[in-house]
């Protein structure tokens, strides 16, 4: 039903590929949501932890990548990791979970979590940066987007002490996040 007319073009061998197709129908969202063949393809892909997306050829090359940092470009939640290093991980993770489930708003959760870190040594920050792991494929994603002319931005509801080195390592054009104040080697 998709009628591929190209071989697989591997963007990242074994991880990401594109196949150019000439669909036999207009692939609107409504059509794909109601098409049993497409749903079977999506289900088979999901069973193998793969995503399938249909994008018009005229819109396939993107001009911008805006990526969240925590649990997207890096493998974990940086503020939770910082709290873990400070010995208050469970308390901060519980607030994070309440925020993610909509029980409390983001700003309140952020202020509450940062207040719990007040007075901690800023050495925790350098330890956190050293321990942070990139999600496999993050660098390839940014390099591929840049090679194709896209502007790439890293964003976070966390802090710029993390987005700065992660953005530099991956090759993002710029980064945007909150700023954590430090004075006399202590988190304020």
Put a short name on every predicted segment.
Residues 4, 10-20, 57-60, 70-185:
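Alpha-helical substrate-recognition element adjacent to the catalytic core
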């Amino acid at each position: 039903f998709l009628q591929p007319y190209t071989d697989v073009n591997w963007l990242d061998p074994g991880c990401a590929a594109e196949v150019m197709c000439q669909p036999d129908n207009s692939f609107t969202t409504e059509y794909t949501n109601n098409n049993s063949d497409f749903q079977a393809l999506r289900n088979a892909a999901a069973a193998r932890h793969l995503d399938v997306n249909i994008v018009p050829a005229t819109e396939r090359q993107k001009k911008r990548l805006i990526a969240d940092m925590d649990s997207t470009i890096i493998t974990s939640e940086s503020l939770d990791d910082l709290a873990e290093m400070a010995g208050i991980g469970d308390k901060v993770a519980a607030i994070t979970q309440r925020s993610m489930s909509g029980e409390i708003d983001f700003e309140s959760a952020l202020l509450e979590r940062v207040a719990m870190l007040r007075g901690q040594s800023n050495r925790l920050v350098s330890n956190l940066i050293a321990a942070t792991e990139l999600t496999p494929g993050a660098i390839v994603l940014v390099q591929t987007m840049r090679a194709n002319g896209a502007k790439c931005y890293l964003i976070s509801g966390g802090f710029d002490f993390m987005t700065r080195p992660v953005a530099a390592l991956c090759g993002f054009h710029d980064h945007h996040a909150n700023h954590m104040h430090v004075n006399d080697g202590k988190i304020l």
